[in-house]
Amino acid sequence: MEKSLHFYRDGLGLSTDGIVGKEFEHGAVAFFDLQAGLRLAIWKRDDIAHDTKLKKTAPSPTEFTIGHNVGSKEEVDEVMARAKKAGAAITVPPHDTFWGGYSGYFQDPDGHLWEVVWNPDWEI
């Protein structure tokens, strides 16, 4: 969790109070503010399995992506550069898409896949 905390807080600049809930068994979590009412929460996988009562399975980066929509091609480049500097693995460098947008993909320290994307039809 410390590596992910550092990545999201120090590398990507997301606001957080750090890791809280350490006093509880299976309770350690860090919340990052994304926008009003929307937060990213990071937990240890064992703790998620315990809390949800689901069997822990092998991680797969292709289960889902987290989309980070921005307002310009330049902003895609900036976010991707910040992620790389923070330790992300760039899986697809920023590029023009077949549908007229611009995007790139990276994996965070835990292997979660992010797409940073500009859609010319959306106002951000």
Question: Across the structure, where does each feature detected by a protein language model lie?
Answer:
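Core segments of cupin and vicinal oxygen chelate
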Residues: 1-47
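A short, acidic/glycine-rich surface segment
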Residues: 25, 47-54, 123-124
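Vicinal oxygen chelate
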Residues: 30-34, 53-124
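Short, charged, solvent-exposed linker or helix-capping segments at domain edges/interfaces
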Residues: 43, 52-54, 116
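Non-catalytic surface loops within mature trypsin-like serine protease
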Residues: 36, 46, 70-72, 108-110, ...
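Short hydrophobic-acidic sequence motifs that mark active-site Asp/Glu residues
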Residues: 39-41, 65, 113
